[in-house]
Amino acid sequence: MIALGVNIDHVATVRQARGTTYPSPVEAALVAEVAGADAITLHLREDRRHIQENDVVILRDRLKTRMNLESAVTEEMIAFACRIKPHDICLVPERREELTTEGGLDVIRHFQQVSVACKRLAEAGIRVSLFVDAQAGQIDAAVEAGAPVIELHTGRYADAATPEMQQVELETIRTMAAYAFGRGLQVNAGHGLHYENTVQIAAIPELSELNIGHAIVARALFVGFAEAVREMKALLQQARA
């Protein structure tokens, strides 16, 4: 069965919009676990636009599933992760002006920096994932860097302008998921997935986990957070039925 990682970033986005103490991303994470989430994903950005350090610290001791911490490959963030010791860390690219992560980590270009980070995190007992575009070269670089897991960036698929273009992107993800799996990696995927486009991705047999957040938070406005998680979990189960 494919796992569902629920990203709680945008619960924190609502909180930070007014500088209040609510809604609590910690509470959202605990509700998501009860509703069937297999992991909780959260991105501690350098600009701290949503998730804050204290959210990570509190959740680390309260989660019953797994914490998947997303972070940039910086000394500050790697040191923080080594101190907190999440179950998993997904290294992502980051630009302050972006609305959300816009593409995969260029492991080829930043190979030395990524390799050092992978080694350091692994020595701290943290499983490392690299968020990469669905390209063989990036997958090969991830293997060489020592990452046991990759997360394929599904943004181009999610943002495709036509059904035909989306199908092309889907085939690319299918091909690269199989390629990465064949190279011995655990293969996850995420970015831009929602209730209308997730089943096709979840049906790819080599994928182990999907990380989904914005769509679940948006759906929760109308049906509640627990039900939004349950509905997404049902779609993943449907895809593997």
UniProtKB/Swiss-Prot annotation:
Keywords: Cytoplasm, Pyridoxine biosynthesis, Transferase. It catalyses: 3-amino-2-oxopropyl phosphate + 1-deoxy-D-xylulose 5-phosphate = pyridoxine 5'-phosphate + phosphate + 2 H2O + H(+). Its main location: cytoplasm. The active site is at H43 (proton acceptor), E70 (proton acceptor), H191 (proton donor). GO terms for biological process: pyridoxine biosynthetic process. It holds the Pfam family PdxJ. InterPro entries: Aldolase_TIM (IPR013785), PyrdxlP_synth_PdxJ (IPR004569), Pyridoxine-5'_phos_synth (IPR036130). It is found in: Cytoplasm. It comes from the Bacteria. 1-deoxy-D-xylulose 5-phosphate binds at D9, H10, R45, H50, T100. Its EC number is 2.6.99.2. GO terms for cellular component: cytosol. Coiled coil: none annotated. Homooctamer; tetramer of dimers. Catalyzes the complicated ring closure reaction between the two acyclic compounds 1-deoxy-D-xylulose-5-phosphate (DXP) and 3-amino-2-oxopropyl phosphate (1-amino-acetone-3-phosphate or AAP) to form pyridoxine 5'-phosphate (PNP) and inorganic phosphate. Belongs to the PNP synthase family. This is Pyridoxine 5'-phosphate synthase.
